[in-house]
Amino acid sequence: MKYADISLRLYMVFLRKYLESCGCEPDLIALIRLISRQMDPIRKAFLDNQMYEHTLNASGELQAQMDTWADEHLIKVVGESGLVRELASEEQADIIRFENSRCEYCMVMDPLDGSSLISTNLAVGTIVGIYENGGVLQPGSKLRAAFYTLFGPLTVLVVSVGKGVQSFAWDPESEHYLLLKDHFSVPEGKQYGTGGVRNEWLLPHLKVIEYFDQNGFKIRYSGSFVADCHQLLVYGGIYTYPGSEKSPNGKFRLLFEANPLGFIITQAGGRITDGRRNILNIVPEKHHQKTPVYIGSKGIIEKIEEIYKNL
């Protein structure tokens, strides 16, 4: 990232300064900055990790080499930091505890969301949620911070510490995250993306899609939850992966995907629901728990809940 007037850098807001202005504790700032700075080595590792492993993750999904690389890298860095007591990763069967931690923060993460798209060079990302009080089995409403990184033309960090949503772009020249957009507000867009298999959809979801089609919604779907959420953060609309006949609880993990992204979208004025309740209010029973997801513009979510209620 280069600027015609180098003095413009003096007026840029850096990630650290923003977090300080929000009154974040020094250890929380250190943790967010530590994790966010790992996105540069993760991005550089894409070139040498293009293939799939012959292994499955804890959710029974085929692992890409980058899933494993990013997961192991982040676990190592976080474990050595002394900033995290407990960590749950989508790629790990068990919760990891760091007994040497001097802090009581706990962390949930999807090290590389959308990794099946790596071979097609489409956008993928990393999702992170941070809680206080040393345990990961907390509702999303209790998140102290949540952020994701989107690896696209820019490496973009979207973060919320409970005071709105901001995005920062990684500047490889200065090796800092610079403020890209301040105070997102999810507009009431008319686009949607939906996962799943149509002939397995349940009646409420079929009615939801019928409503979209009858009201002129356009389909926008990439296959990466991070990328699709970022799109609706900018343009509005809805993204959904519903429950189905074969998988009534849907596909997305409550802790690693739904809660952090739902927290961010909610902080930007949107909402997240499973069709009947606010997902951020669900108390997790296990760390790989799944949930149906509808996430996006507030008005559209309210309409979806109305459709569910009337069936």
Curated annotation (Swiss-Prot):
Catalytic activity reported: beta-D-fructose 1,6-bisphosphate + H2O = beta-D-fructose 6-phosphate + phosphate
Compartments it resides in: Cytoplasm
Family in the record: Belongs to the FBPase class 1 family.
EC number: 3.1.3.11
Keyword terms of this UniProt record: Carbohydrate metabolism, Cytoplasm, Hydrolase, Magnesium, Metal-binding
Cellular component GO terms held in the UniProt record: cytoplasm
The protein's name in its UniProt record: Fructose-1,6-bisphosphatase class 1
EC class of the enzyme, as a word: hydrolase
Annotated GO biological process: fructose 1,6-bisphosphate metabolic process; fructose 6-phosphate metabolic process; fructose metabolic process; gluconeogenesis; sucrose biosynthetic process
